[in-house]
A protein has these predicted regions:
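A short, Lys/Arg-enriched amphipathic alpha-helix followed by its capping loop at the start of a domain
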Residues: 3-10, 27-40, 166, 201, ...
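Short loop/turn segments at strand-loop or loop-helix junctions that form parts
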Residues: 11-14, 72-74, 125, 132-136
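Conserved acidic, metal-coordinating active-site core of Asp-based
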Residues: 115-207
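Short, flexible loop segments at the rims of nucleotide/cofactor-binding pockets, characterized by
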Residues: 18-22, 47-48, 184-186
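A generic structural motif
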Residues: 37-41, 169-173, 203-204, 226-228
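Mg2+-dependent phosphoryl-transfer enzymes with acidic/Ser/Thr/Gly-rich catalytic loops
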Residues: 2-5, 25, 185-250
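Asp-based phosphoryl-transfer active-site loop
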Residues: 4-23, 69, 195, 219
Length: 250
């Protein structure tokens, strides 16, 4: 690997390397690890925790082949399979604020009329609170159904507005997370947080690939950060096609 360019390619997971909450295809996995990694350094950055990333990357062995794995926006950092850093939102904002956010979110969601509601509406992670109006235990069909409903009725966008208004004096940020949820995290703990683990001298360039790169999306900040070259993708297949073009892979 000594002949690799001193460049890091960072990839979002959902919508970029996989369909939302699904496994990476065998074709794209092999392409990344055999073709892309032989040319540049590769890393993952996701709002999900380590176990979910491992599931989507088709196992821990595959996950650990990436040079960097930034879980929960980089608040948890693995380098070549070794845990390097881990922090907690609870330590940062405290129990009182945490409960205020959760109580408000549950109250707001209780008034929503949706095509379906299931379970696991609030998920506590090291770096964030993940809030899901339909419930994370929904089936794939229910997930897709909510996603279509959300695009029409702006359920999550309105939810973000309500959270921002309620907690405007807090040091918290709110963003659309993946396909069905809202992420709540300390301001500055978006995906740009992962860049704090990469020294300025480590790479000549850092390229980021993501699908939620417009304002309000959870890729927006890192996509627009001065330290990265941002690339918007529309699907895992589009990611592959762009990589083939940038790296001259036939």
């Amino acid at each position: 690997m000594d002949d690799r360019k001193n460049i890091l390619y960072l990839f979002d997971v959902d919508g970029t390397l996989t369909k939302p909450r699904q496994r990476i295809s065998e074709d794209l996995k092999n392409f990344l690890l055999n073709e892309v990694k032989s040319r540049v350094n590769v890393g993952l950055v996701s709002g999900s925790d380590y176990s979910k990333i491992v599931e989507q990357m088709d196992g821990e062995e595959t996950t650990n082949q990436f040079d960097h794995v930034f879980c929960e926006n980089g608040v948890v950092h693995y380098q070549q399979g070794q845990l390097k850093k881990s922090e907690s939102i609870l330590t940062y904002i405290g129990e009182q604020t945490l409960q205020k956010v959760i109580n408000f979110a549950l109250g707001y969601m209780s008034k929503l009329e949706l095509p379906a509601k299931r379970g696991n509406f609030v998920e506590f992670r090291s770096s964030m609170i993940n809030i899901c109006p339909v419930g994370r235990s929904c089936s794939q069909a229910e997930r897709d159904q909510f996603s279509q409903f959300d695009m029409q009725h702006k359920i999550r966008a309105n939810f973000v507005d309500a959270l921002q208004n309620e907690f405007k004096d807090s040091k918290l940020s709110f963003a659309l997370g993946g396909q069905i949820s809202v992420d709540v995290f300390p301001t500055g703990w978006d995906k740009t947080y992962c860049l704090n683990h990469i020294s300025k001298d480590s790479y000549n360039e850092i390229h980021f690939f993501g699908d939620k790169t417009t304002p309000g999306g959870n890729d927006y900040e890192i996509f627009n950060d001065d330290r990265t070259v941002g690339h918007t993708v529309t699907s895992p297949q589009d990611t592959k096609e762009q990589l083939k073009q940038y790296l001259n892979i036939l």
